[in-house]
Structure formats: C-alpha cells, structure tokens
Design a protein with these regions (language model features):
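Short beta-strand segments enriched in small/hydrophobic residues
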Residues: 1-17, 113-117
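Periplasmic-binding protein-like
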Residues: 6, 68-78, 176-184
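Gly/Ser/Thr-rich loops at beta-strand to alpha-helix junctions
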Residues: 9-13, 77-82, 119-122, 184-188
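A short, Lys/Arg-enriched amphipathic alpha-helix followed by its capping loop at the start of a domain
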Residues: 19-32
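N-terminal beta-loop-helix "entrance" segment that forms/cooperates
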Residues: 35-57, 151-156
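Glycine-rich, highly charged phosphate/nucleotide-binding loops
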Residues: 48-65, 159-167
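Short, acidic/small-residue loops that bind anionic groups at enzyme active sites
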Residues: 88-109
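Active-site rim beta-loop-alpha module in soluble metabolic enzymes
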Residues: 121-122, 129-183
C-alpha cells in the first residue's frame, strides 16, 4: 500500500519532511510506503480560513496527482481537514482527515474533551466548527490556545512541550476534561 501525505504548508525543507515521513512510517506495516510532501506555494501555515482557501486548490491538484501516480490513499496533514470534501468529490482513493480521526477517537475514549490549538485567533473558529458536529457538541468542553504559531512550534520543542503540559493541566483543572485532542499536527 502507498499513502501520500500532504502538509498544506509551503516552504518546508526536505529534512523536515523526511523526519515526518520517518515518524509516520513507524506507525504502519512494513508493507506500507508513506510519502510526505508539502505544497510548493501558498501559505506557510494554516492559521485562518483565508489560509485554507488558498491551500485548498493546491491540495486538490496534489490529490489528483497522487491518484494518477497510483497512491492508495491521500492524507491531508492538518487538523482542520481543509478541503477534504472537495478532494473526496474529485478522486476515487480514500482521503483521510486527521481531525476527523482524532475527534472520532475522542468520542470513543472521553466523557469530556478539550482541543488545544496553536494561536488565540483559532479558538473561536475551531469551537464554532466543532460545535456543528453532533458528535463533538456532546463532549467538547473547550478549545484552548498555546499562543505559539504553527511555524514556531518546533523552534524550541522542550519549551513547547512544557507549555503544552501547562495548558493541558489547566484544561483538566478548569474544564473537567479527561481527554486532550491536539488541534495541530505540528504538535505530533
């Protein structure tokens, strides 16, 4: 099986992409080939609806190319699952949205959960989107921000991890949650 993973951020270097490929390859069988790339132009990160709109057509081109090249599935490497409905309309291979997957797992595992996103500007947008889903509206307690932009998450991984633990602890104490969903794949 061959899976194409596309990060909807532009300008990522090959070393970073290879690191993601290695990380993801550890989670699949040895018979599965994972190929990770990013969009070649467009937004540097997905932090707004505008970023999603600009990245969407680029994702569509890449999904069509992946199907043409014989990939068995296409993964949009972003919690927002941007453009997955349009991608599914245009290709016959499965299109996977990690946000959908994470929220399905949270529904199964949790009584009450919190989504941790990157910046404060994403909180209300993410909350509104999640509250449109009948499954998440029952169990979503809150959406909280790290206040670290996507492009800076890996600048100081130790500091990001310390702050992430702090925000998670606050969500447990203040919101009574039992599960945390990371709302950015840059936190993986």
């Amino acid at each position: 099986m061959r899976i194409k993973v596309l990060i909807p951020n532009s300008g990522m270097d090959r070393k970073t992409l290879n690191a993601r490929e290695t990380m993801l390859s550890r989670a699949v069988s040895t018979e599965t080939e994972i190929s990770v790339d990013c969009i070649q132009s467009g937004p540097v990160s997905i932090e707004s609806v505008t970023d999603e709109v600009f990245a969407g057509p680029l994702l569509l081109q890449e999904a069509i190319r992946a199907e043409r090249e014989g990939y068995d599935a296409f993964v949009v490497y972003c919690f927002s699952d941007l453009a997955i409905t349009a991608l599914r309309e245009n290709v016959d291979i499965p299109v996977i949205g990690p946000g959908e997957c994470a929220l399905a797992a949270a529904d199964i595992l949790s009584n009450k959960f919190c989504v941790i996103t990157t910046v404060e500007g994403n909180v209300s947008r993410t909350y509104r989107r999640l509250m449109q889903n009948p499954i998440t509206q029952k169990k979503l307690s809150s959406v909280r921000a790290l206040n670290i932009p996507v492009a800076e998450l890996r600048d100081d991984p130790d500091a990001t991890c310390v702050y992430l633990k702090k925000v998670c602890a606050e969500a447990v104490a203040e919101d009574g949650i039992d599960t945390v969903v990371l709302g950015c794949l840059g936190l993986a």
